[in-house]
Design a protein with these regions (language model features):
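C-terminal alpha-helical cap/extension of soluble enzyme domains
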Residues: 2-8, 14, 19-27, 49-52, ...
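Active-site beta->alpha loop and helix N-cap motifs at the rims of alpha/beta catalytic domains
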Residues: 2-160, 177, 331-335
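Long, contiguous hydrophobic alpha-helical segments, chiefly transmembrane helices and signal peptides
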Residues: 20-21, 46, 56, 61-64, ...
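Conserved active-site and cofactor/substrate-binding residues in soluble primary-metabolism enzymes
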Residues: 34-37, 41, 70, 74, ...
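Short, solvent-exposed alpha-helical surface patches in well-structured domains
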Residues: 41, 74, 168, 253-256, ...
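Hydrophobic transmembrane alpha-helix bundles
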Residues: 53-54, 91-102, 124-137, 157-166, ...
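Residues at alpha-helix termini
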Residues: 85, 113, 198, 214-215, ...
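Catalytic alpha/beta core domains of metabolic enzymes, predominantly
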Residues: 140-144, 155-273
């Protein structure tokens, strides 16, 4: 775990590789319980079978907005326990977004005690008074904790920080060392790097890596929170092989590989159901049921209640058919 003072030096080398954002497997009536055995298997699969170097816990893909404080704490504890039993060096990233700063503080303090390496705070989701309000929120947490902090600049919050607002947070709070820029605005990430060059940036628009931004130092070598375990199996490591080429600056080979392997087409086929609900097409969602159905197609356990908790809806049959067909075309399943 990095403390606040050393966070930026630590982040430059520690935040590297594929960081898997874990889903939450539900069970019981209406998904009121968590299938802890299934969750443990998922962690072991990501860290052990796939050998990925980072985890991203209790964020949007995990449906944090539907979880109790107690559930979120336990999900982190189990992830730390299972991951470190396999690889003591695995980086555990805990997302502590909450409506109230006091709840975020409770989760951040718990993450610090439970062995998380870094905490990410998503841009506050309600009644946010712009960049100044976000800065106040971060300060409230930073003044009361001693752990590396990251920003999660997600459009699902309803407000996206500008590069200037994010850079001001970095300037004011020494613990802030990384950001997941989830709004697919590469021009803002480029400007943010100019304003705060010490910040490790993951730009979710992965085309910037093909443009040489990693070698230029604009973005970092870590996929801070993705679902890499849904894009490969231990037998077909297309996702890891592609990113290994990128990280080694073999960009032409990487692009050729993504095309020839079917990875590019697979990502296009899958992404629509992961992040878009047809009944609200202008909203960037994390459709838990879609991620979990994809996991089930690969044979991963998703609990006896494989849907999202409210207020999300059940995944339609069309989505299931298209997701399964995408996996078949990509060659990760036979049928």
């Amino acid at each position: 775990m990095a403390n606040a003072r050393d966070a930026r030096q630590w982040a430059r080398t520690a935040l590297h590789g594929i960081g898997n954002s874990l889903y939450t497997p539900f069970c019981g009536q209406d998904g009121d319980d968590i299938d802890w055995d299934a969750y443990r298997i998922l962690v072991r699969h990501c860290v052990g079978a796939l050998g990925h170097s980072m985890l991203w816990v209790t964020s949007g893909l995990a449906e944090f907005w539907s979880l109790t404080i107690g559930e979120r704490k336990r999900l982190l504890e189990v992830a730390v326990e299972e991951a470190r039993a396999i690889n003591k060096e695995v980086v555990v990233q805990s997302c502590t977004a909450a409506l109230s700063a006091k709840e975020c503080l409770e989760l951040t303090r718990h993450a610090q005690q439970a062995g998380a390496d870094i905490v990410y705070i998503q841009t506050p989701m309600m009644e946010l008074h712009g960049g100044e309000g976000a800065l106040n929120y971060f300060k409230y947490i930073a003044d009361r904790t001693d752990i590396a902090l990251g920003m999660f600049n997600s459009p699902s919050s309803g407000y996206v920080l500008s590069a200037y607002e994010a850079a001001h947070i970095v300037e004011e709070i020494v613990a802030v060392c990384a950001t997941k820029e989830g709004s697919f605005r590469p021009h803002q990430s480029r400007l943010l790097h100019e304003l705060a060059p010490e910040l490790v940036i993951w730009e979710c628009d992965s085309t910037v890596y093909r443009a040489g931004w990693l070698k230029a130092g604009i973005v970092g070598p870590g996929q801070l929170g993705t679902a890499g375990y849904l894009f490969e199996t231990p037998q077909k490591r297309a996702f890891s092989e592609y990113w290994d080429l990128v990280w080694n600056d073999k960009l032409v080979e990487a692009m050729d590989y993504a095309q020839a392997s079917g990875l590019d087409q697979f990502e296009l086929d899958m992404r629509g159901w992961f992040t878009r609900y047809p009944g609200r097409p202008d909203y960037f969602t994390h459709w838990g049921g879609a991620y979990k159905y994809a996991a089930s197609v690969l044979g991963l356990p998703v609990g006896s209640y494989p849907e999202s908790r409210p207020p999300q809806v059940k995944l339609p049959d069309q989505a299931r058919q298209e997701i399964r067909e995408a996996y078949r075309k990509f060659g990760l399943i036979d049928d």
